[in-house]
């Protein structure tokens, strides 16, 4: 039941846009510190009714089917203290621009949490690819060493949930994956340690230019007290002299790189820290050079936190990677089936393909992000036996493959189920070492997110294996 007196006192209103997880916990936290909170949700479905009731019992007014437009806010704009927006809303949205011109604070859920968590140690991880693995692995290593270091931000639990439950008082380190969308709406967040994993063309439908995208990522590192970069990434390496001073890692054995870098792996699998052996890498389950880069970034951060080489090494032996990232879902003597649904762009797909030896058939498709695909096609020409395409981008990708000189078989389908029926027929007549699900595109043409897409793929594979 909503307290009408609470709603009549409309001064210092905090308007939260969106009933997603982060919006809900931002609203709950703000209300718990006696802020007046209103939530607007643009959709109007049955799935929102239960949470609407729960929030209204906390004296949070929830309006469904309410568009985020300035004319709806203008009548009570003088009473607005802040507007908390979802990362999915572009920062150049017309309403956001007008609100900022009026001096209204426009932030995201992470910035809301920062206001109470800023006295806690923070590690902020960003990058086009690799940031989720780095976030999860670093959190694992710190937690294995009796530090409470939850992973949060773009993955895991919304930080406002910790603020709401008072659990933040026990946190030793916040390990936050921060997308470019989240960095834009978290201007006050200043991590103790900032990590930049990779930088390649992505999200240009949102950021318009590569320079804008780069500068958003860069801003997080500039605000960090201590910075860690990936020298193997050519775009970061090319900005070596212009980026804020920090620690660099490399997996290259080219000794000329060691002058610029602080961490690398030698030819005997020893982790090297500033020219000295830290420990020998013996138990690390993740495939590919890109995951060795991720590991070195994590080691550099863990060392800055204060962990010994032995403690880091011991923590690696029981690490289990997150699903949908080069996830082996079936393996026998003849065939391995890998789910890499997290490969939502061409660079991520290339990294996965290059980590596999032997004959590959690949499944790709989804919604294109406007990326350049020439390098991806060149890798396919060298590494795969044939390609199966599905979804919204299938026709565009087929033409791109043909135009780039891909001479092997291309099969095109609208949906995964039909595609996999043909794939299993193909496998009966062709010997292939690996079936790789590497969409190279976003999932939004047919799925809510890459997790749903990956789960759907795994379900279909499970059904096919039972039949076959």
UniProtKB/Swiss-Prot annotation:
GO terms for biological process: cell division; cell wall organization; peptidoglycan biosynthetic process; regulation of cell shape. ATP binds at residues 127-133. Pathway: Cell wall biogenesis; peptidoglycan biosynthesis. Its EC number is 6.3.2.9. It holds the Pfam family Mur_ligase_C. It comes from the Bacteria. GO terms for molecular function: ATP binding; tetrahydrofolylpolyglutamate synthase activity; UDP-N-acetylmuramoylalanine-D-glutamate ligase activity. The keyword ATP-binding applies. It catalyses: UDP-N-acetyl-alpha-D-muramoyl-L-alanine + D-glutamate + ATP = UDP-N-acetyl-alpha-D-muramoyl-L-alanyl-D-glutamate + ADP + phosphate + H(+). It is found in: Cytoplasm. GO terms for cellular component: cytoplasm. Keywords: ATP-binding, Cell cycle, Cell division, Cell shape, Cell wall biogenesis/degradation, Cytoplasm, Ligase, Nucleotide-binding, Peptidoglycan synthesis. Cell wall formation. Catalyzes the addition of glutamate to the nucleotide precursor UDP-N-acetylmuramoyl-L-alanine (UMA). Belongs to the MurCDEF family. This is UDP-N-acetylmuramoylalanine--D-glutamate ligase. The lineage of its organism: Bacteria, Bacillati, Cyanobacteriota, Cyanophyceae, Synechococcales.
